[in-house]
Amino acid sequence: MATSNKNMLLNYVPVYVMLPLGVINVNNVFEDPDGLKEQLVQLRAAGVDGVMIDVWWGIIEQKGPKEYDWSAYKSLFQLVQKCGLKLQAIMSFHQCGGNVGDVVNIPLPKWVLDIGESDPDIFYTNRSGIRNQEYLSIGVDNKPIFHGRTAIEIYSDYMKSFRENMSDLLKSEVIIDIEVGLGPAGELRYPSYPQNQGWQFPGIGEFQCYDKYLRESFKAAAAKAGHSEWELPDDAGTYNDVPESTEFFKTNGTYLTEKGKFFLTWYSNQLLNHGDQILDEANKAFLGCKVKLAIKVSGIHWWYKAPNHAAELTAGYYNLDDRDGYRPIAKIVSRHHAILNFTCLEMRDSEQSSDAHSSPQKLVQQVLSGGWRENIEVAGENALSRYDATAYNQIILNARPQGVNKDGPPKLRMYGVTYLRLSDDLMQQSNFDIFKKFVVKMHADQDYCSDPEKYNHGIPPLKRSGPKIPDDVLNEATKPIPPFPWDSETDMKVDG
C-alpha cells in the first residue's frame, strides 16, 4: 500500500507515459480529444506523473519556411494540464515511419523534401547511394541551402517559436522537459539500421556518410591529417551482414588500423559536434525557463559482446572494450545542463538470442554509470512494448540499481522513466493493473507526489551553457571506467 514518508520520497522516480504517435494527425488536427482525455484521467488516477509527446517538425512547419501552426498542439497541451499531468515535449526533427513501432507516417516538411529533389545529398546516404529521408544529414548542419537558412538555424527557429507559443505552459511549469531531437527516432545517431531499406535484427547496419557534404568533410579532415589518399570505408559490408563477413569488422579488421581509427573518430565526432551545436541552440531558446533539456541515445545492444561492437560503430557510437563511446556524450550533455535519456531499460541478456552477441544489461550499466560519473542526470525508456512483471522489475532495477535507502536518497537513482507507450493494450484491465503496481514501485511505495522539490527534482531556471569542451577533455572521457555495481534484482518488485 502506498504511503508518504519524507525519507522514502527521496527514492521516488517519476513515471511518464509516451502518447500515441498519431495523437495530432499529419493534417495537424487533434483527432480524438475525448478518447485521449478518458485515458489521461486513468493515467493520473494510476499515479502517473506526466506524458511525453512528439512535436513533429513535419506537421508544425509543413506549409512553408517559418510558417508554424501550433494550434492543435496547444489544445492537446491544455488538455494534459487540465488532467493534472506534466509534459515532456520532443522536438521531433525526424520523420515518423520506417522505424520499429512506427504505425503512422509523418514525413519531413514538403518544402524540405522539395529541396531534396534537386539536392538529394541533404539526406544521409549509404555506400550504395541509397538516400534516407528520415532526418537531414549532419553534413548540411551549417550549409545555408534551405531558403537561406542552415539546418541548425531551422531547428533553432523552431525551438524559439515553440517557446513563444507555449510561454504560458512553460511559465506554469506544465512543460518540464524539452527532448531535443538529434537524429532518426529523435536519437543522437546515424540511421544505420533502417527497416525500410531491408535491415533486420541483428544486422550490423551500414555507415551513413556518403552524401557529398559528409564526403567532403571527411576528405578535408584526412588531408589535414596528412592522408589525402584516404577514402570512406568500402569494406564494411551491408545492412544484414555479420561482422566476421566484412573486412572492416572482422578479427584484426580495418577498424583496428590507423586508417580505420581515424575514420571512426571522425564519424563519431561529427555526431558529438552535431549534438553540441543543437543543444547550444536549445539552451539559448529556452534560457531562463524552468525546464530541463534532454537528449536521447539509442540502446544498440546487438554485437555489444563482440570485440568490434559493429552495430554501435555504424550508428556513430565509437564504443569498444577499450574505448568508451558514451562518456564523451555525457560530457557534452553536462555542458548544456541537460539530461541523457537512454533506452532498452526493460531488456535482460537472458532474453536475447546468442547469435546477436547482445548485452542490453551491460550496455545500460555502462551508459548510466558514465552519465553518473559525469555528474549528469540520467533518464530512460523501454525500447519495446512489454506488459509483464519481468520487464517492469528490470526497469525498476535500472532506476535504482542499488535499491532504496530508507534513510534518504539512494546512492544511484535515475531522474525519470518514460513508458512506451499509451495504447489500448496498456489500458486492457489485467495489463493496466500490473502497470499501476509498477508506478507505485517506481515511486518507492509512496503516494503520487505533485511537488518535485520533495524528491529533489525542483527545476531552477535554465542557465546558459558552459564553455565548449576541448577535444583533449572529450578524448580523455573515452578511457573506460568500470561501471557501478548493480544488484542482481530489484528490492521493489511489482510481483514481490
Curated annotation (Swiss-Prot):
Annotated stretches, region: Disordered? 455-496
One GO molecular-function entry:
beta-amylase activity
Reactions the enzyme catalyzes? Hydrolysis of (1->4)-alpha-D-glucosidic linkages in polysaccharides so as to remove successive maltose units from the non-reducing ends of the chains
Q: Name one Pfam family in it.
A: Glyco_hydro_14
Residues annotated for substrate binding in this entry: D54, H94, D102, K296, H301, T343, N382, A383, R421
Q: Is Endoplasmic reticulum one of the keywords UniProt gives this record?
A: no
Provide this UniProt record's keywords sorted from A to Z.
Answer: Carbohydrate metabolism, Glycosidase, Hydrolase, Polysaccharide degradation
Query: EC number(s) on record?
Result: 3.2.1.2
Q: Which example biological process does GO assign this protein?
A: polysaccharide catabolic process
Q: What is this protein called?
A: Beta-amylase
**Organism encoding this protein:** Medicago sativa (Alfalfa)
Q: What is the lineage of its organism?
A: Eukaryota, Viridiplantae, Streptophyta, Embryophyta, Tracheophyta
